[in-house]
Curated annotation (Swiss-Prot):
GO terms for molecular function: ATP binding; tetraacyldisaccharide 4'-kinase activity. This is Tetraacyldisaccharide 4'-kinase. Belongs to the LpxK family. It is an enzyme of class 2 (transferase). ATP binds at T54, V55, G56, G57, A58, G59, K60, T61. InterPro entries: LpxK (IPR003758), P-loop_NTPase (IPR027417). The lineage of its organism: Bacteria, Pseudomonadati, Pseudomonadota, Alphaproteobacteria, Hyphomicrobiales. Keywords: ATP-binding, Kinase, Lipid A biosynthesis, Lipid biosynthesis, Lipid metabolism, Nucleotide-binding, Transferase. It catalyses: a lipid A disaccharide + ATP = a lipid IVA + ADP + H(+). Pathway: Glycolipid biosynthesis; lipid IV(A) biosynthesis; lipid IV(A) from (3R)-3-hydroxytetradecanoyl-[acyl-carrier-protein] and UDP-N-acetyl-alpha-D-glucosamine: step 6/6. Disulfide bonds: none annotated.
Amino acid sequence: MASEAPPFWWDEPDWRALALAPAAWIYGRVSGRRLIRAVPPRVSLPVLCVGNFTVGGAGKTPTAIAFARGAIARGMKPGIVSRGYGGNYSGLHLVDPGHDGARHVGDEPLLLARHAAVALSPDRVKAAEYLKSLGCDFIIMDDGFQSARLHADFSLLVVDASRGIGNGRVIPAGPLRAPLTDQMRKTDALLCIGKGNGADFVIRQAARAGRPIYHAQLRPSSSATVAGRRWLAFAGIGNPDKFYESVRQAGGEVVETHSFADHYSFEPDDIRGLVDMARRQGLGLITTAKDHVRLATMPGVPPEFLSKLAVLDVDLEFDRTDALGHILDTVVERFKSRLHG
C-alpha cells in the first residue's frame, strides 16, 4: 500500500484547492467536531501522543524513537501503540522485528520495535492495556491524535520547518487532517523539526494559543559511510526532500534522486531500474531506514542488492537539551494528577 499527497497541497492555494473547497468544508466540519467533542477512553498509564496536523511526513517516527530512548534512560519501560499503516493485521498484534515483514505490520512499527515493544490494533485502548500486561509503564501513541480513540496526557504535534502545513487547507483541498484551529485546541505543544520558514504560520498560531514551541533537528547517525561519496538517493516516504538533504548534511554528494510514494511497495522492476541507473553513472545507492525495512522483508529482493545498499538513519536532537526530559516529566505529572484527581 502506498499513499501520495498531491503536490499542489504544498504550494500556495490555486484553482484546485478552490474547486475542492466545498468538499474540504464538509470534511473539516466532521473531523473538527469529532476531535473537539470526543471524550477518549483512558488507561491507567501515562500516555504521550506524537502526532501531526497533516498527512505526509513530518518526523513522527524519529520523534517517537527519541522519546522511547529518553524514557528508557529514565528507568521507565515504554511501549508504543500504533495503527500500523500499510500492514494487514486487523486484530491485536505484538510486533516481532525478527519475524514480521513490512507488508504485514507496516514499516514504521518495525523501526519502532527496535527500541520498544510495539502493539498494533485499531483499538488503541486494547493495545495499551496489552502493553501494560507486559510490564510497560509509559505509553507512546504513534499518531492517533485526530482519531481520539485513546486519551493522551500530553499531545505533541510535529511539523516540518520547511513544509509547514502546506497550503493550510483541509483534505481534499490540502493536507490538514482537520481545521487548524480545532487541532490547536487539543494540542499541548508544538515540535518544529529542521530549518526553514515554512512553519512560521503554524508557529505563530501556537504562540497565540499559548502552546509551548520546541525545536529539533534530524542528525545523520551514520555519516562516516556517506561522506565523500556520490549517490543515487531514493526514498518512498512522506517528505523525500528531507532525506536527500540529510545525505548532503552527512557529506554525501547527491547526484540523482528517485522519489516513490509514501510507504511504497517496491517491485522487481523498480530495483532493476535503480541498479541500472546507479551503475551507468558510477553511483552508490542510498535510502532511508524505512525503505530499507520494507526492502529487507520483501520476498525476492536480491541479497547482493541489500548488501550494497547504504542506509542513512537519523536521530532527533532537541535544540534545548532539557526539552525531552521536561516533556516526559509533564506527561507523568499530568497522569498522576488524572489518577488522583
